[in-house]
Protein backbone atom coordinates (compact mmCIF):
# COMPACT_ATOMS: atom_id res chain seq x y z
CA UNK A 1 0.00 0.00 0.00
CA UNK A 2 2.84 2.37 0.84
CA UNK A 3 4.45 1.79 -2.54
CA UNK A 4 1.13 2.35 -4.31
CA UNK A 5 0.66 5.71 -2.59
CA UNK A 6 4.18 6.92 -3.31
CA UNK A 7 3.72 8.21 -6.90
CA UNK A 8 0.59 10.17 -6.02
CA UNK A 9 2.21 11.55 -2.87
CA UNK A 10 5.22 12.78 -4.83
CA UNK A 11 3.03 14.58 -7.36
CA UNK A 12 1.14 16.36 -4.56
CA UNK A 13 4.15 17.11 -2.37
CA UNK A 14 4.64 20.76 -1.46
CA UNK A 15 8.10 21.60 -0.16
CA UNK A 16 8.83 25.01 1.42
CA UNK A 17 10.94 27.47 -0.52
CA UNK A 18 14.61 27.53 0.43
CA UNK A 19 15.69 30.13 2.96
CA UNK A 20 18.93 30.61 1.00
CA UNK A 21 19.00 30.46 -2.79
CA UNK A 22 21.87 29.80 -5.21
CA UNK A 23 21.01 31.60 -8.47
CA UNK A 24 22.36 30.44 -11.83
CA UNK A 25 25.07 32.94 -12.80
CA UNK A 26 24.59 34.85 -16.04
CA UNK A 27 26.97 33.57 -18.68
CA UNK A 28 27.52 30.16 -17.10
CA UNK A 29 26.08 28.48 -20.19
CA UNK A 30 28.01 29.58 -23.28
CA UNK A 31 25.25 28.41 -25.60
CA UNK A 32 27.53 26.35 -27.85
CA UNK A 33 25.52 23.82 -29.86
CA UNK A 34 25.96 20.19 -28.75
CA UNK A 35 27.71 21.08 -25.49
CA UNK A 36 25.92 19.67 -22.45
CA UNK A 37 23.77 22.40 -20.84
CA UNK A 38 25.23 23.97 -17.72
CA UNK A 39 22.24 22.72 -15.73
CA UNK A 40 21.51 19.07 -16.40
CA UNK A 41 17.79 18.22 -16.74
CA UNK A 42 16.74 15.52 -14.29
CA UNK A 43 15.73 13.22 -17.15
CA UNK A 44 19.28 13.44 -18.58
CA UNK A 45 21.15 13.15 -15.28
CA UNK A 46 23.26 10.01 -15.07
CA UNK A 47 22.05 7.20 -12.85
CA UNK A 48 24.40 4.68 -11.25
CA UNK A 49 23.22 2.65 -8.25
CA UNK A 50 22.81 -0.90 -7.00
CA UNK A 51 19.01 -0.96 -6.94
CA UNK A 52 17.52 -3.81 -8.97
CA UNK A 53 14.27 -1.86 -8.91
CA UNK A 54 13.78 1.78 -7.96
CA UNK A 55 12.35 2.08 -4.43
CA UNK A 56 8.92 3.66 -4.18
CA UNK A 57 8.87 5.14 -0.69
CA UNK A 58 5.77 6.55 0.99
CA UNK A 59 6.88 9.99 2.16
CA UNK A 60 4.54 9.75 5.16
CA UNK A 61 6.29 6.57 6.28
CA UNK A 62 9.86 7.72 5.57
CA UNK A 63 12.08 8.09 8.59
CA UNK A 64 15.77 8.88 9.08
CA UNK A 65 17.76 7.66 12.06
CA UNK A 66 21.04 9.38 13.03
CA UNK A 67 22.91 7.34 15.63
CA UNK A 68 26.20 5.67 16.54
CA UNK A 69 29.08 7.55 18.15
CA UNK A 70 26.94 10.52 19.16
CA UNK A 71 25.69 12.10 22.37
CA UNK A 72 22.08 12.18 21.20
CA UNK A 73 20.33 10.00 18.64
CA UNK A 74 17.97 11.76 16.24
CA UNK A 75 14.96 10.40 14.39
CA UNK A 76 13.39 12.59 11.73
CA UNK A 77 10.26 12.30 9.63
CA UNK A 78 10.01 14.09 6.29
CA UNK A 79 7.96 16.96 7.73
CA UNK A 80 10.52 17.36 10.52
CA UNK A 81 13.25 17.70 7.92
CA UNK A 82 11.49 20.18 5.66
CA UNK A 83 10.36 22.32 8.61
CA UNK A 84 14.00 23.29 9.02
CA UNK A 85 15.55 26.14 6.99
CA UNK A 86 16.30 24.75 3.54
CA UNK A 87 19.45 25.59 1.62
CA UNK A 88 19.66 25.68 -2.19
CA UNK A 89 22.98 24.77 -3.79
CA UNK A 90 24.08 24.06 -7.36
CA UNK A 91 26.45 21.10 -7.22
CA UNK A 92 28.13 18.96 -9.87
CA UNK A 93 28.11 15.24 -9.06
CA UNK A 94 30.39 12.66 -10.66
CA UNK A 95 30.61 8.88 -10.62
CA UNK A 96 33.96 7.26 -9.84
CA UNK A 97 33.43 4.87 -12.77
CA UNK A 98 33.36 7.77 -15.24
CA UNK A 99 36.12 7.26 -17.84
CA UNK A 100 38.19 10.15 -19.18
CA UNK A 101 35.82 12.16 -21.37
CA UNK A 102 32.80 10.24 -20.06
CA UNK A 103 29.28 11.42 -19.33
CA UNK A 104 28.73 10.07 -15.80
CA UNK A 105 28.69 13.61 -14.43
CA UNK A 106 25.93 16.19 -14.09
CA UNK A 107 25.14 19.58 -12.58
CA UNK A 108 21.86 20.30 -10.81
CA UNK A 109 20.14 22.58 -8.31
CA UNK A 110 19.68 20.74 -5.01
CA UNK A 111 17.63 21.95 -2.04
CA UNK A 112 17.88 20.40 1.39
CA UNK A 113 19.03 20.56 4.98
CA UNK A 114 22.74 20.90 5.78
CA UNK A 115 23.93 17.61 7.25
CA UNK A 116 26.36 19.50 9.49
CA UNK A 117 23.39 21.01 11.37
CA UNK A 118 21.97 17.59 12.20
CA UNK A 119 25.38 16.30 13.22
CA UNK A 120 25.88 19.32 15.47
CA UNK A 121 22.63 18.48 17.26
CA UNK A 122 23.63 14.85 17.63
CA UNK A 123 27.12 15.66 18.94
CA UNK A 124 29.61 13.28 17.30
CA UNK A 125 32.32 11.71 19.42
CA UNK A 126 35.79 13.20 19.02
CA UNK A 127 36.97 9.71 18.01
CA UNK A 128 34.51 9.40 15.10
CA UNK A 129 35.80 10.02 11.57
CA UNK A 130 33.13 8.59 9.26
CA UNK A 131 29.38 8.51 8.65
CA UNK A 132 27.99 5.28 7.21
CA UNK A 133 24.83 6.07 5.28
CA UNK A 134 22.34 3.37 4.34
CA UNK A 135 19.75 3.39 1.57
CA UNK A 136 16.29 1.86 1.61
CA UNK A 137 17.66 -0.77 -0.80
CA UNK A 138 20.56 -1.68 1.52
CA UNK A 139 23.35 0.22 -0.25
CA UNK A 140 25.90 1.81 2.08
CA UNK A 141 28.42 4.63 1.65
CA UNK A 142 31.24 5.72 3.95
CA UNK A 143 31.65 9.51 4.01
CA UNK A 144 34.46 11.30 5.88
CA UNK A 145 32.90 13.05 8.86
CA UNK A 146 34.99 16.15 8.16
CA UNK A 147 33.32 16.54 4.75
CA UNK A 148 29.89 16.56 6.37
CA UNK A 149 30.77 18.99 9.17
CA UNK A 150 32.89 21.40 7.10
CA UNK A 151 31.20 24.85 7.25
CA UNK A 152 32.65 25.64 3.82
CA UNK A 153 31.13 22.58 2.16
CA UNK A 154 27.33 22.49 2.03
CA UNK A 155 26.64 18.76 2.26
CA UNK A 156 22.89 18.27 2.08
CA UNK A 157 20.07 15.91 2.79
CA UNK A 158 18.41 16.97 -0.45
CA UNK A 159 14.67 16.90 -1.06
CA UNK A 160 14.45 18.63 -4.45
CA UNK A 161 16.35 18.55 -7.74
CA UNK A 162 16.05 21.46 -10.16
CA UNK A 163 13.14 22.87 -8.19
CA UNK A 164 11.02 19.71 -8.09
CA UNK A 165 10.71 16.88 -5.56
CA UNK A 166 13.45 14.35 -6.23
CA UNK A 167 12.64 11.95 -9.07
CA UNK A 168 12.21 8.38 -7.82
CA UNK A 169 15.32 7.24 -9.69
CA UNK A 170 17.39 10.00 -8.08
CA UNK A 171 16.50 9.23 -4.49
CA UNK A 172 12.97 10.36 -3.60
CA UNK A 173 12.13 11.43 -1.00
CA UNK A 174 15.60 12.20 0.45
CA UNK A 175 19.17 11.69 -0.76
CA UNK A 176 22.66 12.88 0.15
CA UNK A 177 24.57 15.45 -1.91
CA UNK A 178 28.18 16.04 -0.86
CA UNK A 179 30.27 18.47 -2.95
CA UNK A 180 33.69 17.24 -3.98
CA UNK A 181 33.32 13.52 -3.33
CA UNK A 182 32.53 10.75 -5.79
CA UNK A 183 29.04 9.35 -5.42
CA UNK A 184 30.10 5.93 -4.17
CA UNK A 185 31.25 7.47 -0.87
CA UNK A 186 28.63 10.19 -0.53
CA UNK A 187 25.58 10.28 -2.81
CA UNK A 188 23.32 7.80 -1.02
CA UNK A 189 19.85 7.83 -2.55
CA UNK A 190 16.68 6.83 -0.66
CA UNK A 191 18.68 7.42 2.53
CA UNK A 192 17.16 6.11 5.78
CA UNK A 193 20.08 5.75 8.20
CA UNK A 194 23.19 7.70 9.21
CA UNK A 195 25.59 5.99 11.60
CA UNK A 196 28.46 8.01 13.02
CA UNK A 197 31.39 5.62 13.29
CA UNK A 198 35.01 5.09 12.23
CA UNK A 199 36.67 3.89 9.04
CA UNK A 200 38.42 1.14 11.02
CA UNK A 201 35.10 -0.16 12.40
CA UNK A 202 32.79 -0.18 9.39
CA UNK A 203 33.10 -0.76 5.66
CA UNK A 204 30.71 0.36 2.93
CA UNK A 205 29.43 -1.38 -0.21
CA UNK A 206 32.09 -0.27 -2.71
CA UNK A 207 35.01 0.07 -0.31
CA UNK A 208 34.50 -3.58 0.62
CA UNK A 209 35.02 -4.32 -3.08
CA UNK A 210 38.41 -2.63 -3.33
CA UNK A 211 37.60 1.01 -4.07
CA UNK A 212 39.35 3.62 -1.94
CA UNK A 213 37.67 4.83 1.23
CA UNK A 214 37.51 8.63 0.90
CA UNK A 215 36.81 9.31 -2.78
CA UNK A 216 37.74 12.94 -3.59
CA UNK A 217 36.76 13.85 -7.16
CA UNK A 218 39.72 14.29 -9.51
CA UNK A 219 40.02 17.38 -11.69
CA UNK A 220 38.73 16.56 -15.17
CA UNK A 221 37.99 18.16 -18.53
CA UNK A 222 36.45 16.90 -21.73
CA UNK A 223 35.93 17.88 -25.35
CA UNK A 224 32.29 17.66 -26.40
CA UNK A 225 32.49 19.57 -29.70
CA UNK A 226 33.40 18.42 -32.27
CA UNK A 227 32.33 14.79 -31.87
CA UNK A 228 34.94 12.05 -32.18
CA UNK A 229 35.50 11.51 -35.90
CA UNK A 230 33.20 14.43 -36.67
CA UNK A 231 33.49 17.35 -39.05
CA UNK A 232 33.63 21.03 -38.25
CA UNK A 233 33.60 24.11 -40.42
CA UNK A 234 36.70 26.25 -40.84
CA UNK A 235 36.84 29.96 -40.16
CA UNK A 236 37.32 29.42 -37.24
CA UNK A 237 36.76 25.87 -35.98
CA UNK A 238 34.86 25.62 -32.68
CA UNK A 239 36.12 23.33 -29.92
CA UNK A 240 34.15 23.27 -26.68
CA UNK A 241 33.33 21.26 -23.61
CA UNK A 242 33.22 21.18 -19.83
CA UNK A 243 35.72 21.01 -16.95
CA UNK A 244 35.36 20.46 -13.22
CA UNK A 245 37.50 20.54 -10.08
CA UNK A 246 34.96 20.26 -7.29
CA UNK A 247 35.56 22.17 -4.10
CA UNK A 248 38.64 23.85 -5.59
CA UNK A 249 37.22 25.35 -8.79
CA UNK A 250 38.39 25.73 -12.37
CA UNK A 251 40.72 28.66 -13.11
CA UNK A 252 41.65 27.85 -16.72
CA UNK A 253 41.11 25.35 -19.52
CA UNK A 254 43.79 24.86 -22.17
CA UNK A 255 43.63 23.13 -25.54
CA UNK A 256 46.44 21.79 -27.72
CA UNK A 257 45.80 20.94 -31.37
CA UNK A 258 48.10 18.51 -33.19
CA UNK A 259 50.57 18.62 -30.26
CA UNK A 260 50.97 22.36 -30.70
CA UNK A 261 51.17 24.97 -27.92
CA UNK A 262 48.52 25.11 -25.22
CA UNK A 263 45.92 27.79 -25.87
CA UNK A 264 43.67 29.27 -23.20
CA UNK A 265 39.97 28.72 -23.84
CA UNK A 266 37.19 31.17 -23.06
CA UNK A 267 35.37 30.13 -19.89
CA UNK A 268 31.76 30.42 -18.87
CA UNK A 269 30.94 32.37 -15.71
CA UNK A 270 31.83 30.88 -12.35
CA UNK A 271 29.04 29.25 -10.42
CA UNK A 272 30.81 28.09 -7.29
CA UNK A 273 33.87 25.94 -6.77
CA UNK A 274 31.46 23.00 -6.60
CA UNK A 275 30.13 23.40 -10.15
CA UNK A 276 31.64 22.65 -13.53
CA UNK A 277 32.55 25.32 -16.10
CA UNK A 278 31.94 25.36 -19.81
CA UNK A 279 34.77 26.34 -22.15
CA UNK A 280 35.13 27.19 -25.84
CA UNK A 281 38.08 27.78 -28.17
CA UNK A 282 37.74 29.19 -31.66
CA UNK A 283 40.82 28.22 -33.67
CA UNK A 284 41.87 28.91 -37.24
CA UNK A 285 42.80 25.45 -38.50
CA UNK A 286 43.69 24.28 -42.00
CA UNK A 287 41.46 21.76 -43.72
CA UNK A 288 42.09 18.12 -42.98
CA UNK A 289 42.31 15.80 -39.99
CA UNK A 290 43.29 17.13 -36.55
CA UNK A 291 43.64 15.86 -32.98
CA UNK A 292 42.89 18.09 -29.99
CA UNK A 293 43.50 17.42 -26.32
CA UNK A 294 42.34 19.37 -23.27
CA UNK A 295 43.54 19.97 -19.74
CA UNK A 296 42.32 22.10 -16.83
CA UNK A 297 44.01 24.21 -14.17
CA UNK A 298 42.37 24.62 -10.77
CA UNK A 299 42.29 27.68 -8.52
CA UNK A 300 45.27 26.40 -6.57
CA UNK A 301 47.33 26.42 -9.77
CA UNK A 302 47.43 22.64 -10.10
CA UNK A 303 47.49 21.44 -13.72
CA UNK A 304 45.39 18.40 -14.55
CA UNK A 305 47.62 15.36 -14.78
CA UNK A 306 48.35 13.69 -18.10
CA UNK A 307 49.07 10.42 -16.30
CA UNK A 308 46.42 7.92 -17.44
CA UNK A 309 44.61 5.89 -14.81
CA UNK A 310 41.51 3.68 -15.02
CA UNK A 311 38.42 4.40 -12.92
CA UNK A 312 39.32 1.77 -10.30
CA UNK A 313 40.17 2.19 -7.48
CA UNK A 314 39.91 5.99 -7.08
CA UNK A 315 38.79 7.59 -10.35
CA UNK A 316 40.12 7.95 -13.89
CA UNK A 317 42.74 10.50 -14.92
CA UNK A 318 44.46 11.69 -18.09
CA UNK A 319 43.84 14.19 -20.88
CA UNK A 320 40.81 13.77 -23.11
CA UNK A 321 41.45 13.77 -26.88
CA UNK A 322 39.23 14.10 -29.94
CA UNK A 323 40.12 13.52 -33.59
CA UNK A 324 38.07 15.46 -36.14
CA UNK A 325 38.14 16.86 -39.67
CA UNK A 326 38.01 20.51 -40.67
CA UNK A 327 36.03 20.81 -43.88
Residue ranges and their predicted role:
Residues 7-327:
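Structured, non-membrane catalytic/scaffold regions adjacent to prosthetic-group chemistry
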Amino acid sequence: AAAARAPAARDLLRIPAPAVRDPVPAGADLGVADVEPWLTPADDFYRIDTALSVPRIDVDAWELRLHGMVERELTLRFDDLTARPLLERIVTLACVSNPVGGDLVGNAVWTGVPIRDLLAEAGPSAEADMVLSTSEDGFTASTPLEALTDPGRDSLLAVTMNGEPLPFEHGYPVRMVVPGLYGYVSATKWVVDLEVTRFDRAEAYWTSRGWTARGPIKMSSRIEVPAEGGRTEAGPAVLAGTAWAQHTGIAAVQVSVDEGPWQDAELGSVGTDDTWRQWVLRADLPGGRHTARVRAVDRDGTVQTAEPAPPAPDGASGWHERTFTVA
